[in-house]
Amino acid sequence: MTGYPTTLVAALDALPGGEARGFRFIGSDREERYFPYEALRAEAHRRAAFLTSLGLKKGDTVGLVCPENHEFVLTFLGASVAGLVPVPIFPGATFKVTDHYVETLEHILAAAHSRVVICNEKNLEVVSSLKQREGTKDITVLAAEQFFVGQAPPFIAPVITPEDLCFLQFTSGSTSRPKGVMIRHRNLVANSTSFLGPGGLGRTPDDVGVSWLPLFHDMGLIGFVLGTLIVDLPVVLMPTPMFARMPRLWLELITKHRGTITYAPNFAYQLVTKRVTDKDLATLDLSSLRIAGCGAEPIRARTLLEFADRFSKCGFDPKALLPSYGMAESCLAITFHQRGTPMIVDRVDPAKMREGVAVPSTDPSALELVSCGVPFPGHELAVVDESGAPVGERVVGQVLSRGPSVNDGYFENPEATAESFKDGWLYSGDLGYRADGNLYICGRAKDLIIVNGANHYPQDIEWVVGDIEGVRRGNVVAFSVMRDGTEQLVIAAEGNSGDSARLKQQIAQLVQETFGLTPMHVAICPVGALPKTSSGKAQRRKSKTMWESSQLEEHP
């Protein structure tokens, strides 16, 4: 990390002046707002002055529920300059008051002890409803467009140190109620310089990042805002809802701005492969793209290979594909596949995998797992059994990590901290194995389905079911329930009501043929019935709870 600033604020102050480098924000109307670094820096200091005028002091938290990317980034940086601790929060899929969403806001803001929350005019009504809830009745709610206007009051910037909290990243809640991950400036700088430095993506002066990822989530926030500021990498940011409506715009922006680095979860590569037409292909040029990263959810080899094949016509280089592994507790990524080399796919015997051993196989029925690469320099991984003892090569166990990117616990949550952080190691809760130095992720330990003594990974079942015509791919959950003293498999999938009977039969038959499992129940649900986290991950445990209490809506 020699030569890099030691805090986010120091990095912001060190960025070059002039018009050539900065952040470009794409609006919902497709208009572009360009902020050179100097303008970002000036507006951050201006907003810092407004925030401290509210009586906020260094170390205080401030909630950010901003659907507008430029408002989010400017306010986050303003809070950082003021020594405050931003708390990024999902701004909601719609701007309507719903009990569940407002309850989530209340929980996060109350847990973070935030006295102030900044939003935008379009979601002001929703966020203001917090004042009617017990945990946040005294909170101050301000719309950025209305608050940061006029001449800024006097302001003296506090000294920011590497040990200071940079922000609180509340976990997605895919496995539990959200917890506040404490990211210090030293964690952020260590991770950013690792994944963007020579041992990671190998940032060059000519790089341009292009992203549609949500900024309340670590991949978008650190990967394309905070990390890029620390290493001076210009970016183009488009709104997440715009990607959902027009996936091809992601690739159009890469083409227009000669993007070199982008990142997305598995589902996004699948979506553009399916939705971009042959006519669209003729207008795209992806030859500039040297990094097409993938992470944040299970990675499917077939998805990435199909993407590479389809977009080879646009100059896409398959060696740009870069699978990775990480979690909020390690800031962002902690392992990368080696850039510029072909993706590695491990084909293993499914029967042996159910016994917890990844035995190579050439059989057509072999499971395909994608290598997530090796840890960054200065970081370590371990794979251990239930007793905490290291396991051998190709033996499945829990993945542990440690290093300067890894944080030191959850905000005012000693119980959760003690459970996940032991003897300097972060216990991820993820199952995986190592082969030839590479890490392969199998799934979450708590989601493992054990039937007749055999281990089954829910995402394997979900992927197979998602390939059935009529099932909404990416909208399938598999979980186990106890019945008569044994674990039984339940599958819930979103699909068409008219196909309900056929889909149930086809799903049960395919799962039996592929895994030797007979589902106790197959539920076919309407679109949107299955719960997801704010980052789009399936909530298996919540789905299970809803199913067990007869709350999971099914087609008749």
For each of these PLM feature ranges, what is it?
Residues L51-L56, F155-E163, L168-L213, V231, ...:
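Conserved adenylate-forming
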Residues V189-V208, D218-T260, R275-D280, R339:
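Conserved AMP-binding/adenylation subdomain of ANL enzymes
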Residues N475-F479, V490-I491, A508-P556:
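Conserved C-terminal "lid"/linker of ANL adenylate-forming enzymes
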Residues A10-P36, C166-L168, T175, G326, ...:
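AMP-dependent adenylate-forming
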Residues D29, V97-T98, V102, E106, ...:
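ANL superfamily adenylate-forming
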Residues F23-L74, T94-Y101, A157-I160, I183-V189:
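Conserved AMP-binding/adenylate-forming core of the ANL superfamily
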Residues T255, T262, G403, D408-G409, ...:
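AMP-binding/adenylate-forming catalytic core of the ANL superfamily
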Residues R290-A292, I299-N438, K446-L448:
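Conserved AMP-binding/adenylate-forming
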